[in-house]
């Protein structure tokens, strides 16, 4: 088993797509995933197979699947293997597997995993010793906080964090603690969860006032929200720390059923802020959560033709689609300005429009629009045609259309359609193995390099292209 292939799979979403693995599990195809994990050395299938087997209590079979992956020494597989061994009751073997070696002493993931497995084995103090027995950094501090939650060791953790936090407060520039400013937030979190909320709030407020640590205002606002201190939170949200406090304040009001106050506060900020974009986005989200879709659109529609970052058109479309209002989202694509269309129609707007039409029962109209355009002007043209055929109820035509097509998008849609037809083995067969996917990726980037060399950009910037997904697929996936 090749570790480089495993690393590539994880870093490039290679192998069998996770969405397909989940669908196969939902259809009871665990044995098929076991077969593919072993035959193709497919990491996502191995994870899915282990998840399915463990859900059925078949821990020894799960170890049989994950064991060869763990034997490579690749850290994600080592951790997955140790978790399975713990569930098998083979505690000592799990600890031996996950114990960091000499060459891994600086590998944070290895020490985090070791500490978590120690806690899983009931060895909480040993986990604390393992983390604090090596040079501390901010990730290790947060690992210490995470692995000890609910383990009855808060006082010990506070004894460890207290001196570090005090040094940071006294002189954050000293070399010993310059890289440990998160000790302030970590100490506050542990004080809060141990019930010492007034002490936590006092320290957090002082740190925010003195601007100690990164994101002190946000930490203070979040703590006030978690403690239900709405009056104090309002003071923050209407003062110099408003940028950090508004979202926690609005969400706290909403949780209390005081949505009218939340809306009023946001509308006031939209009217008065020099740069209201963040508040407009929060207002859009708030109104969407309340099911007030038309009001949400009206609140931000003045941004829909902006050519800069403050444009909330796509955000509104995605939120509406998530609520099943594809029809209303589709309406937002109409009436856009010529300047906006010139900059955005070919890039993403029409792809999103076709997706929304497909979801709204207008797949045939979308396909007609698509086919009227020159073929070289539409990215992922053939997979999009196939998807629209399927949305129009012509699934077999869509499958036949996809079979000869190259490319990740084509075989992903094909596999999804086959799963929907209950043709599970065919769906797996439609997915190229890892070596084929790697070769496809190399060819893609080679073509891109040749294209850039042949037609250099007028601006000197390299054009960006994405080999994997068309813009319209983002929300649906």
Language model segments and positions:
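C-terminal non-catalytic interaction modules
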Residues: 395-396, 402-404, 411, 415-477
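Solenoid-like repeat scaffolds
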Residues: 5-11, 34-42, 66-74, 99-106, ...
């Amino acid at each position: 088993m090749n570790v480089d292939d495993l690393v590539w799979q994880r870093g490039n979403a290679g192998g069998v797509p996770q969405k397909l693995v989940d669908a196969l599990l939902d259809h009871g195809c665990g044995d098929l995933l076991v077969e593919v994990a072993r035959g193709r050395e497919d990491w996502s299938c191995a994870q899915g197979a282990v998840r399915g087997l463990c859900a059925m209590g078949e821990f020894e079979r799960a170890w049989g699947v994950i064991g060869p992956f763990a034997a490579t020494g690749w850290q994600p597989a080592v951790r997955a293997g140790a978790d399975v061994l713990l569930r098998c009751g083979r505690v000592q073997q799990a600890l031996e597997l996950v114990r960091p070696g000499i060459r891994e002493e600086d590998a944070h993931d290895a020490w985090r995993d070791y500490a978590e497995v120690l806690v899983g084995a009931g060895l909480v103090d040993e986990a604390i010793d393992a983390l604090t027995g090596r040079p501390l950094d901010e990730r290790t501090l947060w690992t210490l906080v995470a692995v000890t939650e609910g383990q009855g060791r808060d006082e010990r953790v506070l004894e460890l964090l207290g001196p570090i936090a005090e040094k940071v407060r006294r002189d954050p520039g000293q070399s010993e603690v310059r890289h440990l400013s998160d000790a302030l937030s970590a100490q506050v979190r542990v004080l809060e969860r141990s019930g010492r909320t007034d002490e936590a709030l006092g320290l957090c407020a002082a740190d925010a006032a003195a601007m100690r640590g990164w994101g002190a205002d946000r930490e203070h606002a979040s703590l006030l929200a978690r403690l239900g201190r709405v009056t104090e939170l309002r003071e923050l949200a209407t003062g110099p720390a408003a940028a950090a406090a508004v979202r926690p304040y609005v969400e706290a009001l909403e949780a209390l059923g005081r949505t009218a106050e939340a809306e009023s506060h946001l509308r006031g900020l939209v009217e008065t802020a020099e740069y209201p974009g963040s508040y407009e986005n929060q207002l859009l989200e708030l109104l969407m959560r309340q099911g007030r879709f038309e009001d949400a659109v009206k609140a931000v529609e003045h941004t829909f033709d902006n050519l800069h970052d403050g444009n909330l058109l796509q955000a509104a479309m995605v939120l509406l689609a998530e609520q099943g209002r594809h029809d209303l989202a589709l309406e937002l694509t109409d009436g856009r300005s010529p300047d906006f269309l010139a900059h955005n129609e070919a890039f993403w707007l029409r792809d999103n429009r076709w997706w929304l039409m497909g979801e709204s029962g207008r797949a045939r109209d979308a396909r007609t629009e698509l086919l009227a355009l020159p073929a070289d002007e539409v990215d992922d043209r053939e997979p999009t045609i196939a998807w629209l055929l399927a949305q129009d109820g012509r699934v077999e035509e869509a499958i036949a259309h996809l079979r000869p097509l190259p490319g990740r998008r084509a075989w992903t849609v094909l596999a999804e359609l086959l799963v929907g037809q209950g043709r599970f083995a065919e769906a797996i067969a439609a997915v190229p193995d890892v070596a084929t996917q790697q070769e496809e990726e190399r060819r893609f980037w080679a073509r891109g390099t040749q294209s850039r060399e042949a037609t250099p950009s007028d601006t000197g910037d390299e054009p960006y292209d994405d080999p994997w997904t068309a813009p319209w697929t983002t929300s649906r996936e």
